[in-house]
A protein has these predicted regions:
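Rossmann-like AdoMet/SAM-dependent catalytic core
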Residues: 1-34, 39-41, 48, 54, ...
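Short, conserved loop/helix-junction motifs that constitute active-site signature segments
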Residues: 34-36, 55-59, 79, 119-125
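A structural micro-motif
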Residues: 38, 62, 82, 125-126, ...
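Active-site flanking residues adjacent to catalytic metal/cofactor-binding acidic residues
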Residues: 43, 67, 103-105, 130-132
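S-adenosyl-L-methionine
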Residues: 72-110
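Distinct, well-ordered alpha-helical segments
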Residues: 96, 111-120
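Conserved beta-strand signature within the Rossmann-like core of class I S-adenosyl-L-methionine
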Residues: 122-137
Length: 237
C-alpha cells in the first residue's frame, strides 16, 4: 500500500521541452528549457559548479546565487553574475525569492528538514530541481530521515504547487547498497515546474535516451514503470 501511495505521488507528467544542463554524470540534471527564470538559487554545490556554469551559458542575462556552508566556490570569484554565501540554509525564509527563478537543491539529506513547512516561499519558483535522500545514515550530523508520512505530506504539498516532469535514479545509492524506501530507490532526482493541470500523465519509462545518464557507476536503472497503471487508475475515476 505504501509503495502505491509513493508511486501515485511521484508520477511524472508528459513534457517535451526538456534539456540536460550540466555534465553527463553526477551534477547534471534534466530540466525544462522554458522555466529557467532570471535567477538560479543553488543550495549545496561542494565547489562543483558545472550545472551553474552551463545554466549561465544558455541564460546569459541571469544571475546565480549559491549557498553552501561546507565548501568554497571558485566560480563566484570568476564570474560577476555569481554570488556565494558560505552558509547552510535551514529555512526557506532565509532566502530572497522575490522574482521568478529556478531553484536547485542538493543538500545531502536535509531536503525534508528544509521543505517540511509551508511552501509559500516558493511561489516565485518557476522550476524546482532537487535530489532527495530517503535514508541518511551516511550523514549522521543531519536530522534523522523522515517518516513515511512526512515524505507523503511533502510530496502532496509539492504536487499542489508544481507538476513533476522528470524523475531519475541516482545510482550512487545502489552502489552504496542503501535500502529501498517502501519500494523506491534511496536517491532520486526530481524536476518540478510551476503547476500545469493541462499536462497528461507520462507513459514512458525513465531513463530517457540522450537526456538521462548514470551518475557515476555506469548504472541507469529503469524507473517510472508504474505510470501506465496510474494513468489507467486516473481515467477510471
Amino acid at each position: 500500500m505504501q509503495k502505491m501511495i509513493l508511486e501515485n505521488l511521484l508520477t511524472p507528467k508528459k513534457y517535451n521541452h526538456k534539456i540536460r544542463i550540466g555534465p553527463k554524470s553526477d551534477g547534471g540534471y534534466v530540466v525544462s528549457k522554458n522555466h529557467l527564470g532570471k535567477r538560479l538559487i543553488s543550495l549545496g554545490c561542494e565547489n562543483a559548479t558545472k550545472f551553474e556554469e552551463e545554466y549561465l551559458s544558455i541564460n546569459q542575462e541571469a544571475e546565480v546565487v549559491i549557498y553552501d556552508g561546507t565548501s568554497s566556490c571558485d566560480l563566484a570569484s570568476k564570474d560577476s553574475r555569481v554570488s556565494f554565501h558560505n552558509k547552510n540554509v535551514y529555512s526557506l525564509s532565509e532566502l530572497t525569492i522575490d522574482k521568478p527563478c529556478m531553484m536547485q537543491i542538493d543538500i545531502e539529506g536535509s531536503e525534508l528538514f528544509l521543505l517540511n513547512e509551508q511552501l509559500d516561499q516558493l511561489k516565485n519558483v518557476e522550476q524546482l530541481v532537487m535530489e532527495i535522500h530517503f535514508h541518511k545514515e551516511k550523514y549522521p550530523a543531519f536530522p534523522v530521515h523522515g517518516s513515511f508520512q512526512e515524505w507523503v505530506n511533502l510530496f502532496k504539498l509539492l504536487n499542489g504547487m508544481f507538476s513533476l516532469i522528470h524523475i531519475h535514479v541516482n545510482d550512487n545509492g545502489i552502489v552504496q547498497k542503501r535500502p529501498k524506501f517502501f519500494g523506491m530507490y534511496d536517491l532520486l532526482e526530481l524536476t518540478y515546474i510551476k503547476k500545469d493541470d493541462t499536462l497528461e500523465v507520462e507513459d514512458r519509462h525513465f531513463p530517457l535516451e540522450n537526456l538521462d545518464y548514470p551518475n557515476a557507476f555506469g548504472m541507469n536503472p529503469s524507473i517510472g514503470w508504474w505510470t501506465k497503471q496510474t494513468k489507467l487508475l486516473m481515467s477510471e475515476k
